[in-house]
Design a protein with these regions (language model features):
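Membrane-interfacial amphipathic helices and adjacent loop/beta segments
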Residues: 1-10
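Non-catalytic C-terminal accessory region of glycerolipid acyltransferases
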Residues: 10-143
């Protein structure tokens, strides 16, 4: 089943946990920042520049105690090839070093994405200026 999530609420997290425990996969687009700008992004090096990536997949995997895999699809010689790879069995985010640990996971993902972008640079699509300034959380209007 397809579940589009724009915000992780406790109800959504419980639903995702049930899906994982029943053997289903949860796919998160790792090269996009959150729809609602909540500031949960991490700036890391990507293709020679700094770029913001979401922290959400790693925080969620840490809370749900589930592994992370990556999935890339490249068209090579007229045939689509899927690359499904183990990323981490467990995401550990220690309280004292949480920001550093998140940065390490996000950088590892950016490095892996970069590898596939270098293999097929015209097959990575984004529809906004990817290498912009760091993402700032949305400000709630004051009353």
């Amino acid at each position: 089943s397809l579940l589009q999530v724009t915000e992780i609420s406790p109800a959504v997290a419980i639903s995702l946990d049930h899906k994982i425990k029943s053997g289903e996969f949860v796919f998160i687009v790792g090269d996009r920042i959150p729809v609602r700008n909540n500031g949960r992004t991490q700036e890391v090096s990507f293709l020679g520049e700094n770029a913001s990536f979401s922290q959400g997949p790693y925080i969620l995997a840490s809370l749900l105690k589930c592994p992370i895999y990556t999935l890339f699809c490249l068209k090579e010689s007229g045939t689509y090839h899927l690359y499904f790879e183990h990323f981490s069995e467990k995401i550990h985010l220690p309280r004292k070093d949480r920001e550093h640990a998140l940065r390490e996971y996000v950088q590892r993902f950016a490095d892996r994405l970069q590898k596939y972008c270098m293999m097929a640079p015209l097959q990575w699509f984004n529809f906004y200026f990817f290498w912009s300034t760091p993402v700032e959380p949305e400000q709630k209007p004051s009353s």
